[in-house]
Amino acid sequence: MKRTYQPSVTRRKRTHGFRVRMKTRAGRAILNARRAKGRKRLAV
């Protein structure tokens, strides 16, 4: 059986990228929470 994590930069960016987060209200909430926490990287 193959492993479940088969890395792909494209898929990573499309599902967890900054622009995707900015699209929805919930995504923007995630970014704001990470800003408030002081995360160095907000999104992938």
UniProtKB/Swiss-Prot annotation:
Membrane spanning residue stretches: none
Organism superkingdom: Bacteria
Gene3D superfamilies from the UniProt entry: 1.10.287.3980
UniProt-recorded Gene Ontology molecular function terms: structural constituent of ribosome
GO biological process, alphabetically ordered: translation
Keywords: Ribonucleoprotein, Ribosomal protein
InterPro entries listed in its UniProt record: Ribosomal_bL34, Ribosomal_bL34_CS
GO CC annotation: ribonucleoprotein complex; ribosome
Similarity field: Belongs to the bacterial ribosomal protein bL34 family.
Entry-linked HAMAP family: Ribosomal_bL34 (MF_00391)
UniProt protein name: Large ribosomal subunit protein bL34
Species for this entry: Bordetella pertussis (strain Tohama I / ATCC BAA-589 / NCTC 13251)
